[in-house]
Swiss-Prot record:
Gene name linked to the record: MT-CYB
The keyword Cytoplasm belongs to this UniProt entry's keyword annotation: no
GO biological process, one term: mitochondrial electron transport, ubiquinol to cytochrome c
Chain sites annotated for binding heme b b566: H97, H196
Binding site for heme b b562: H83, H182
The keyword Membrane appears for this protein: yes
Protein name as catalogued: Cytochrome b
């Protein structure tokens, strides 16, 4: 008799996606980050739901409601810190997952890659709106500065900013709508992640060599479920250690001060995972130019497949491109560091150099591919 796992309409979908799924036998730990992102999303939705039960999206009570969660709710402090640090873990996994896709040429699966880019943008939007909700100093001023960038759009910019604010400044209507979107977007992200998986299973997973893996595939369960559980254990260990030992390591002290529109913090900056883009934004003296560079720093991912000129899919056997890739990784770390520094010498000059290097390296990668093709006489 055939197992219900293979015949039941619902079980059949789960079976073909997570149990009997044919998977390349040589995929490394870099392929673990997909499942870790799923786990991060579940952690964020679960902790977020419990926080939403006690949070009030009103400028007069938002800050005190977060203090109430931390002090008076059973394990409220832990739920809040898991949610805040869980976002950091989410972005660590996101950046590593995207980096793996770039290194091993997974961007050639166009549908999967494009949905992934949309997922990255939506996650960034969700995190930004979540950062505004505690209504601390950095929440208020971060929201004011970032939303005000839209005023750089010709003709409609000023009206667009006021439409987003719901008035003439960041106030109660802004907070209410940010809470609404912050609540609904994770569920849209979950739906998009399902589509992302659907497209991935249409083509099958890539592998480190970049070669066809059809002749050598194994079942996903038990081999890769065990591997994923091990990865998840390490992630949870890191998240709980961060939450319980150094909970404020990645947060801004200014956010423990109630939002005050009359007092500007000495240095307005977003959360650490946006700092690379923030550095690129402020490296350009022109407002519109900075906004365009900021957008391009993320949207450049969509044109990466069109610039792939190598005869090999993966970078595994391409030493020149490998040097460029790891230089790009170091450049992104430099941009992140500079974003947390004040706009003064030497940080300003380093930021401008690193911003130019970011776009230059991405431009040089297709040229290095052509050079490697010539060296290999392809």
């Amino acid at each position: 008799m055939t197992s219900p796992r293979k015949t039941h309409p619902l079980m059949k979908i789960i079976n073909s996606s997570f149990i009997d799924l044919p998977t390349p036998s040589n995929i490394s730990s870099w392929w673990n980050f997909g499942s870790l992102l799923g786990a991060c999303l579940m952690i964020q939705i679960t902790t977020g739901l419990f926080l939403a039960m006690h949070y009030t999206p009103d400028t007069s009570t938002a800050f005190s409601s977060v203090a109430h969660i931390t002090r008076d709710i059973n394990y409220g402090w832990m739920i809040r810190l898991l949610h805040a640090n869980g976002a950091s873990m989410f972005f660590v996994c996101l950046f590593l997952h995207t980096g793996r896709g770039l290194y091993y040429g997974s961007f050639l699966f166009l549908n999967t890659w494009n949905i992934g880019t949309i997922l990255l943008l939506m996650t960034m939007a969700t995190a930004f709106m979540g950062y505004v909700l505690p209504w601390g100093q950095m929440s208020f001023w971060g929201a004011t500065v970032i939303t005000n960038l839209l005023s750089a759009i010709p003709y409609t910019g000023h009206n667009l900013v006021q439409w987003i604010w719901g008035g003439f400044s960041v106030d109660k209507p802004t907070l209410t709508r940010f809470f609404t979107f912050h609540f609904i977007l994770p569920f849209i992200i979950t739906a998009l992640a399902t589509i992302h998986l659907l497209f991935l299973h249409e083509t099958g997973s890539n592998n480190p060599s970049g070669m066809a893996s059809s002749p050598d595939k194994i079942m996903f369960h038990p081999y890769y479920t065990t591997k994923d559980i091990f990865g998840l254990t390490l992630l949870l260990l890191l998240l709980t250690s961060l939450t319980l030992f150094t909970p404020d390591l990645l947060t801004d002290p200014d956010n423990y001060t109630l939002a005050n529109p009359l007092n500007t913090p000495p240095h307005i900056k977003p959360e650490w995972y946006f700092l690379f883009a923030y550095t690129i934004l402020r490296s350009i003296p022109n407002k519109l130019g900075g906004v365009l560079a900021l957008l391009l720093s993320i949207m450049i991912l969509t044109i990466i497949p069109a610039t792939h000129l190598s005869k090999q899919q993966s970078m595994m056997f391409r030493p020149i491109t490998q040097i460029l890739f790891w230089t790009l990784a170091a450049d992104l770390l430099t941009l992140t560091w500079i974003g947390g520094q004040p706009v003064e010498y030497p940080f300003e000059a380093i930021g401008q150099t690193a911003s130019i290097a970011y776009f230059l390296i991405i431009t040089l990668i297709p040229l290095s591919a052509l050079t490697e093709n010539k060296l290999l006489k392809w």
